[in-house]
Amino acid sequence: MKKIQIAIDGPASSGKSTVAKIIARNLDLIYLDTGAMYRVATFVALQKETDDAKEIIEFIEKNPISFMNGQKGQEVLMGSENVTEVIRTNEVTNTVSKISAMTEIREFMVAEQQRIAKNGGIIMDGRDIGTVVLPKADLKIFLVASVDERAERRYKENLSKGIPTDLERLKIEISERDRKDSTRAISPLKQAEDAILLDSTGKTINEIVQFIEDKAKELM
């Protein structure tokens, strides 16, 4: 069986991570959460109150990002510290576009992601996987959904974690995040020419997963 690379790109809260994790489990692939890696860098920036890319990178090099399967699914570590929950706060969410747009940060993260992915058998999701990180991925999906649907998903997710959230505020934040991600100078959010456009509005997670798995199995 061929060890393929799957790239899933799309805007914030379009369901990329949820879908990628399920597919990774079903098809026995490694799931590399690229968004979490940039969130870790953002968390470091906020903790250290710095926007110096070199300082952020040096700290992460001393406390490498890694992933492990925990009781509630995949957990994110920075060195020995479990940062799974703290990198999902609204403060991190609203700052991650700024940090991830830094050239030095992106180059560092892309090199790390490519190193992990080079042997295949991997699925990655993010903003520029199919265009920058894995331009030769076997299967590329560009997953989108309406702002209202994405806000509703994030709202329910935050409530389930006990995070106080205002739905209308979320809609504004997601729209602004879309604008930032699509217009930034470095690796803007855009669909790769050879990616399959998949609109998840009104679709269940199972329907999305099944569609992508069927495409993947044709290549394996």
Swiss-Prot record:
Pfam families (alphabetical): Cytidylate_kin
InterPro entries the record matches: Cytidylate_kin, Cytidylate_kinase_dom, P-loop_NTPase
A GO term for molecular function: CMP kinase activity
Residues that hold ATP according to the record: G10, P11, A12, S13, S14, G15, K16, S17, T18
Subcellular location: Cytoplasm
Record has Nucleotide-binding as a keyword: yes
Sorted UniProt keywords: ATP-binding, Cytoplasm, Kinase, Nucleotide-binding, Transferase
GO CC entries: cytosol
GO biological process entries: nucleobase-containing small molecule interconversion; pyrimidine nucleotide metabolic process
EC number per UniProt: 2.7.4.25
Keyword Electron transport: no
Gene3D superfamilies found in the cross-reference section: P-loop containing nucleotide triphosphate hydrolases
Domain of life: Bacteria
Catalytic function, reaction form: CMP + ATP = CDP + ADP; dCMP + ATP = dCDP + ADP
HAMAP family, per database record: Cytidyl_kinase_type1
PANTHER family: CYTIDYLATE KINASE, CYTIDYLATE KINASE/PANTOATE-BETA-ALANINE LIGASE
Family: Belongs to the cytidylate kinase family. Type 1 subfamily.
Protein name, as recorded: Cytidylate kinase
Organism in which the protein naturally occurs: Lactococcus lactis subsp. lactis (strain IL1403)
